[in-house]
């Protein structure tokens, strides 16, 4: 499992990396997409963090998980174990280093508020 272990000084490119990745993944969610959020340490201006872009995707429901997972695979993502009912997880590693983590939650899931409070 590839993980980033180093904490890096804040990088002003992190919000831009979120925006670029957000555009890449949005089409894979179609009509079920409600919204996306840059979450985690890289979303906090000025905060040192592991350089992994965390994205929360809120959906109305998990309509076609197989098609979505295939789309995400074409972007270099691997679907991990569901973190709970209604909370799917994808990760992207480049050259053995974790670069992105995507949490896909059904609207109303308790983890949404927790992740947005960070």
For each of these PLM feature ranges, what is it?
Residues 1-37:
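Helical scaffold of the NTase/Pol beta-like nucleotidyltransferase catalytic core
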Residues 3-5, 51-55, 98-100:
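Short amphipathic alpha-helical segments
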Residues 9-12, 41, 46-49, 92, ...:
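Generic structural "secondary-structure junction" signal
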Residues 24-67:
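Active-site nucleotide-donor binding segment shared across nucleotidyl transfer reactions
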Residues 67-75:
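Short amphipathic alpha-helices in soluble, non-transmembrane regions
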Residues 75-110:
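Conserved catalytic core of two-metal-ion nucleotidyltransferases
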Residues 110-118:
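Catalytic cores of NTP-dependent nucleotidyl/adenyl transfer enzymes across multiple folds
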